[in-house]
């Protein structure tokens, strides 16, 4: 069985940048350990915005410029990037919370073989839950897991709410 790890938005702006949190900083070690020990394919997502961010729907609701492509904040956290240095992985630049391309990329990797998917990263309550639900909707019979020790939300409360939502949608939360 193929195993796929989706590392969601472990970018500087979400870890210790303009939208960073203490909880996000605290999970970096767990994320690095997960990447280092994972035996399977890895997909890394990048929240990707441009100079017009504040004029977008998201920018109007969250008027904090972040993950602008080409800026330091768009780059992966340096420890996460180091963990990926010797690994083969695919990247997905997503323009919104969830990637509608992600299921097709998983399909290319698995080519009809049995597989499982594990998601880790930031933010539990926005991009992790969005991508987990997109994958579960696309592959309802596949084991989709979220490792809560490798995730952090905007707040601890919304992190826990997202974990509950995913459990209710038959996503395994460990």
Predicted regions and their residues:
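Active-site acidic carboxylates
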Residues: 1-91, 112, 160, 164-167
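A generic structural signal for short
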Residues: 20, 65, 120-121, 150-151
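Histidine-anchored nucleotide/phosphate-binding helix
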Residues: 30-35, 129-139
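Short internal beta-strands
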Residues: 41-46, 143-150
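Active-site catalytic pocket residues across diverse enzymes, especially alpha/beta-hydrolases
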Residues: 84, 106, 110, 138-139
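Conserved N-terminal glycine/acidic-rich loop preference
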Residues: 91-130, 152-174
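Glycine-enriched alpha-helix->loop->beta-strand junction motifs that scaffold or abut catalytic
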Residues: 119, 139-141
């Amino acid at each position: 069985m193929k195993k796929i790890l989706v590392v969601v938005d472990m970018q500087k702006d979400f870890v210790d940048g303009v939208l960073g949190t203490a909880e996000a900083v605290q999970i970096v070690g767990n994320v690095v350990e997960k990447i280092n020990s994972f035996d399977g394919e890895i997909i890394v997502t990048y929240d990707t915005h441009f100079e017009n961010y504040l004029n977008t729907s998201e920018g109007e609701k969250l008027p904090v410029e972040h993950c602008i492509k080409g800026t330091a904040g768009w780059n992966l956290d340096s420890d996460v990037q180091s963990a990926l240095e010797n690994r083969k992985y695919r990247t997905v630049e997503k323009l919104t919370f969830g990637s509608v391309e992600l299921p097709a990329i998983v399909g290319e990797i698995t080519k009809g073989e049995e597989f499982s998917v594990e998601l880790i990263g930031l933010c539990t309550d926005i991009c992790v839950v969005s991508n987990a639900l997109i994958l579960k909707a696309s592959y309802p019979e596949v084991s989709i897991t979220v490792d809560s020790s490798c995730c952090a939300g905007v707040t601890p409360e919304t992190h826990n709410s997202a974990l509950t939502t995913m459990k209710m949608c038959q996503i395994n939360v460990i």
